[in-house]
Amino acid sequence: MESPPENPRQARRFRKGRFSQVPHISGLILGVFSVLVFLWSISPVLRHILRVPREYIDSYYFDAPDTSLSWALVVALLAAALASRKRIAWWLLTIYLALITLTNIASTIVDKNPNNAVAAVVLLVVIGILIAARPEFYTRVRRGAGWKALGVLIGGMAVATVIGWGLVELFPGDLPQNQRFLWALNRVTAAASVDNEVFDGHPRVFVNTVLGLLGAIALLAAVMTLFRAQRSNNALTGNDESAIRGLIQNFGADDSLAYFATRRDKAVIFAPSGKAAITYRVEIGVCLASGDPIGDPEAWPHAIEAWQDLASQYGWATAVMGASETGATAYKKAGLSVLQLGDEAILRTREFNLNGRDMRPVRQAVTRVRRHGVTVRMRRHRDIPPEDMAAVIIRADDWRDTDTERGFSMALGRLGDHLDGDCLLVEAVMGEGTEDESVVGMLSLVPWGPNGVSLDLMRRKPTAPNGVVELMVSELATRSDEIGVVRVSLNFAVFRSVFEEGSRIGAGPILRIWRSVLVFFSRWWQLEALYRSNVKYQPDWEPRFLCFEDNRELPRVGFASAIAEGFVVLPSFGRKSSQVVKHTGTHAAVPAALVTSEGLHADGSPPDSAPSFTTNGPRRPEQVRVRMNKLAQLADEGIAAYPVAYPPTHTIAAAAKSPEGTRVRIAGRLLRVRDYGGVVFTDVRDWSGDIQVLVDQDNVGREKLAEFAAEFDLGDLIEVSGTIGRSRKGELSLIAVEWRMNGKCLHPLPDKWKGLSDPETRVRQRYLDIALNPKARELLEARSAVVKSLRDSLGGRGYLEVETPILQQVHGGANAAPFLTHINAYNLDLYLRIAPELYLKRLCVAGMEKVFEIGRVFRNEGVDFKHNPEFTILEAYEAHSDYEGMMRMCRELIQAAAVAAFGREIIMRPGPDGELVEVDISGEWPVKTMHGAVAEKLGVDVSPETSLEDLQKLCDANEIPYQSSWDTGAIAQEMYEHLVEDYTEFPTFYTNFPTSMSPLTRPHRSIPGVAEKWDLVAWGVELGTAYSELTDPVDQRNRLTEQSMLAAGGDPEAMELDEDFLQALEHAMPPTGGLGMGVDRIVMLITGGSIRETLAFPLAKPRQ
C-alpha cells in the first residue's frame, strides 16, 4: 500500500478523510439513478412496476419523470462531473437540492404533509454533507463555461424548435395550425413526451419522440459544454523548448527518449525551480506524459507534483507512456500504479557484429542487398544541403505506409528543422556517386546524450530489395566510430515478453491466448512486426512502463495512448497536423525568472549558458568547502596551489643527517602544526622520514609567519628551504626561511594519533593509510625487497624471466574458478588466467631450460585474511630437475627474501600478546608425507593403500565432510586439509599427494597412487607447491580429458581441455621440475601481516 506523500501540496490527492469519498459516492448514486430513468423511459413494463417509488422520489426528493431520455442523460452527465470532483457540478446539485428542500419546507408548513417534513430533513442532511465536502470538489471547468453552456442551450433549443415546428407542419395529425409552433416549443423545451390539456389535438405519435430527442440533444450539448474539462493546447513556446534543450544537455545523457521532449505538439510543465520538467498531451481527459521527467533527478518529484496538481485542477486523469525503470520508480513514489508496457531495443555498437548463428538472418539480408549495389551513407542533419533535406522530407511522406505519422513518446514529428542539426540521417543508396543514384531507404535518429542516437523515423522505398533496413542498421552499428556513436536505441516492442514467452514450448494457456490476441491486432497495429524487426539484431532490452492513477482508468488511458501514438485517428475538426514544425504555444510554462537568467531563446534554440543549477560534483562537507575557499583565495592572489616541479636538494632523512647550519630544501606532507604565536612548529614527512620545521618570526617576520599559518592546512604538500639547526629545547629542526605550496589537500586528515581506525576505510583510502601509517610503509618496503630478492635469486641461478598472456581462451594450470570476460573484436569469451603454467611449459618444450614468471593471476574465489581475487604468483621451471630440487630452491628463495627484508633469516609472527616476535627459519625445514601427517594426527595408519571404506569411516568419526562420489585420493586430501594444513606452524613440506588430485604431476617413481608433488605450509597457509612435471603427452591428455568432463558436469574449478598445450607437449618436453609460490603469502609469512596489508591496493567492498 502506498504511503501518503509528505508534501502538503499532494495531500488532497491522497487524503483519506471522512468526506474524501463524497464525490465518488454522490456520482455513483446519481449514475445508478440515471440508468433507472433511462430504463423506465424505454420500458413501459418497468415504468409500471416502479411507478409507486418513482412517484414518491419525484414528489419529494428528486425529479424522476416517467419518460425522459434527456433527463437520464443530464443526470448521467451530472454524475460523471461529480465523480470527477467538478466544482460547478457541486454548485448545481447543491442549489437544486436546496430548491427542493425549500419546496418541502413550504409544503410542510402549508399542507402539514409528514412526507414533506421527512424529505426536508433528509435533504438538509445531504446538503450539509455536500457543504462539508466542498473542498473535495476542486476540479475546474473551462473559463466562461456557464455562459457558453447557456448560449448552447438557447441556440440549441431554438434550432430544435424550428426543426420540430417543421415536423409538426408535415405531420400535424388533428392539431390546429395556430397551435403547432407552441406544441413544438413545448415539447422541445419541456423535453417530455406527455400530453398537455392546453392543446386541442395531437400530431403523429412519433413526432413527440423526435421533438423530445431534439430537446434532449440541445440540453445534452449545453450540459457537456458546462462540464467539459479544461483543454490543453498541446503546444510549446520557443522559450519552453529552449529551457527543455538546456535540461537535456545537462541531464539527458542517460535517457534515450529525452530529445523527443522537444516535440512541439506537447505541452510542458516545470518544477517551480525550473530544474526539471514533464512534457504531456491531453487526450479525452487524460493528461498523458511522455517518458521520464527531463532534468535533474533530484527535482523530478517536484515536477511530478506540479504535473499532478495541474491535472487535478482540471479533472484530468494522469498517465505516463514509456517511462524507464528509474522514471517509473519516481512516478510510483508519487502515487501512480506501474505496469510494464514493453521493452526498448538497445544496440551496443562495440559489441555488435554479424558473426554467429543468431545473426545469420541479418547477415544473409545484408549480403543480399549488397549484391544489388546498395551502400549506406550517414550524415548529420546539419551537413545536409537544403535541397537534399527537401527531398528527404518528400520521401518520408511518400513512403509512409499510414495516413498519418505515428508516434508520441518516441517520435519527434518533424524533419528539416535547423535546431535538429545533431540528428543523424542514415540512407541506403543504390548506385551512389553515379547519375542513376537512388535512395531506397533511410533512418533518422535523434541524439541520445553525447555518444548515442535514438531511432525516430524509418522508411523504405516500396520497390527496394528486401534487407535494406537490416543493411542500414548493421552499417550504423559497425561504422559507429565514424560518427562517435556507442549506443543505438531502436524501436519499442510493446508486450515483448508476451511474444517471446508465448511462442515457447510449454507456455501456459493464458499466455498463449494473450499472444493470440496481440497477433490478431498486429494486423492493423504492427505489434508483432515491431518485435520481430528488433529481436533479429540481438539487442539489450530495457523495460518501459505505463504509469496510471487507478485501474478503473486503464481503458481510457489505453484509448488516449492509442490516440496519442496515432493508432486511433479521431475526426479532424480542426485538429493540427502531426508534422508540427513551428511553435504554436501562446503561454510559456517555463518559470519567468529562468527566461532572463538562463538566456533562453524564443526560437527554441539551447540557452546561451549552462543553467545555474548544474552540479559541479558531490556535495562537500564544511571542512572541504573551507579548504576549497582557500584554494580559490590562493588563485586570486596568484599563488599556484599545484605548481610545476622544483626538486628538493635532500630527502628528509638525508637532511636530518646533515651537519647543523647546512642549507637544504626538502618537500613532504604537513602532518602536525603547533602555533605558539611568535613561532610555529610543523612536522613534515616524505617517504624517507619526518622532520620538525620551525618557522620563527624573528627569522621571517610577523607578516610572513601569519601568511604561513593562514595558507597551510594539515595534509598540504609543502616545500621548505632553510638551514638545519635546533629548537630552544634542543630538538633537531629545519629553520625555515622560504616555502611554497606543492599541493593543496582539500580533505582534512584523520586523527593524528589514531589514524584510520576502520579497516574498510583503510582499504578504500589506502593512499591515506600509507601516507600516515609507518607500518603500512614498512610493509610495502618489505614487499618490494622480497619481490626483488626473488627475482634476483632466480636470475642469479640462470633463470630467464618471461611474460605470458593474461587473457586466455582456456582456463587451466590450476583447479580454480576463473573470471570471464569478452573481446568484442572477435566476439570471443576469454578468461583472466588462473595460472601461467601451461604457457611456461610451452617454453620448456621450446628449449628454455630455466624460465620463470612473476605476475598477476585471478581466481574467482573468496576474500579473507589469506585470499584475494587477484594475487601475484611466482612460477619457475627447470629442465632436468624434479620436485626435490624445487624443494631446496624454494627454501633458499624464502630464506634469501627474509634476509633482504630484515638482514637475517628470520620472519615476524604475532606473539600471544599480539606483538610481532622473531622466528628463526634458517637451516633445513621439516619434510613429511601427506598420508603420514594425517596418520600422525589420527593416531592410526593411513597410507595410499587405505581403502575407500576405511577412509570414509575415519571421516565420519572425526566429523570431516566428504561426498559419496569422491575417490580415496579426494577423501585423503580433504582429511589433510582439515587435520594437518590448518594446524601447521613452522614451515613444513608435505609430499606425495594423491595422483587423482594432481592432474599435471608425474606419478611417483616408486610409490603407486601418489604423485611427486609437495605443498609448503606455514601457520595454516599454503605458501607454494612443486611438481615433477608430467611430460607424458598421452597420460596428460587422459588426465585433462577427465578434468574437462568434470568441467562439463558443472565443476567450476575443473580445468578445460587445452588442445594447443597438448599438441605442444606431444613435441616432447624434457624431465622438468616446476615450482609455484604465492608472492603475497611469502610477504605475509616474512612480515607477519595479512594479505590485505601486504597489497598496495586490495579489493574493497562496493560503496554503500
UniProtKB/Swiss-Prot annotation:
InterPro entries associated with the record: Aa-tRNA-synt_II (IPR004364), aa-tRNA-synth_II (IPR006195), aa-tRNA-synth_II/BPL/LPL (IPR045864), LPG_synthase_C (IPR024320), Lys-tRNA-ligase_II (IPR002313), Lys-tRNA-ligase_II_N (IPR044136), Lys-tRNA-synth_II_C (IPR018149), NA-bd_OB-fold (IPR012340)
Pfam families per record: LPG_synthase_C, tRNA-synt_2, tRNA-synt_2_TM, tRNA_anti-codon
Disordered: annotated segments: 600-621
Annotated GO MF terms: ATP binding; DNA binding; lysine-tRNA ligase activity; magnesium ion binding; phosphatidylglycerol lysyltransferase activity; tRNA binding
GO aspect biological process, one term: lipid metabolic process
Membrane topology: Multi-pass membrane protein
Reaction catalysed by this enzyme: tRNA(Lys) + L-lysine + ATP = L-lysyl-tRNA(Lys) + AMP + diphosphate; L-lysyl-tRNA(Lys) + a 1,2-diacyl-sn-glycero-3-phospho-(1'-sn-glycerol) = a 1,2-diacyl-sn-glycero-3-phospho-1'-(3'-O-L-lysyl)-sn-glycerol + tRNA(Lys)
PANTHER family named in the record: LYSINE--TRNA LIGASE, CHLOROPLASTIC_MITOCHONDRIAL, LYSYL-TRNA SYNTHETASE
Source organism phylogeny: Bacteria, Bacillati, Actinomycetota, Actinomycetes, Mycobacteriales
Entry keywords, A to Z: Aminoacyl-tRNA synthetase, Antibiotic resistance, ATP-binding, Cell membrane, DNA-binding, Ligase, Lipid metabolism, Magnesium, Membrane, Metal-binding, Multifunctional enzyme, Nucleotide-binding, Transferase, Transmembrane, Transmembrane helix
Species assigned in the record: Rhodococcus erythropolis (strain PR4 / NBRC 100887)
Record NCBIfam families: lysS_bact (TIGR00499), PRK00484.1 (NF001756), PRK02983.1 (NF002821)
Purpose: Catalyzes the production of L-lysyl-tRNA(Lys)transfer and the transfer of a lysyl group from L-lysyl-tRNA(Lys) to membrane-bound phosphatidylglycerol (PG), which produces lysylphosphatidylglycerol (LPG), one of the components of the bacterial membrane with a positive net charge. LPG synthesis contributes to the resistance to cationic antimicrobial peptides (CAMPs) and likely protects M.tuberculosis against the CAMPs produced by competiting microorganisms (bacteriocins).
Disulfide-bonded cysteines: none
Record-annotated membrane-spanning stretches: 25-45, 64-84, 90-110, 117-137, 151-171, 205-225
Family: In the N-terminal section; belongs to the LPG synthetase family.
Residues binding Mg(2+) 1: 1015, 1022
DNA bind region: 664-739
Subcellular location: Cell membrane
Cofactor or coenzyme needed: Mg(2+)
The protein, known as: Lysylphosphatidylglycerol biosynthesis bifunctional protein LysX
The organism's place on the tree of life at top rank: Bacteria
Ranges where the record places region Phosphatidylglycerol lysyltransferase: 1-608
Binding positions (Mg(2+) 2): 1022
PROSITE patterns in the cross-refs: AA_TRNA_LIGASE_II (PS50862)
E.C. numbers: 6.1.1.6, 2.3.2.3
Cofactor stoichiometry and binding remark: Binds 3 Mg(2+) ions per subunit.
UniProt GO cellular component terms: cytosol; plasma membrane
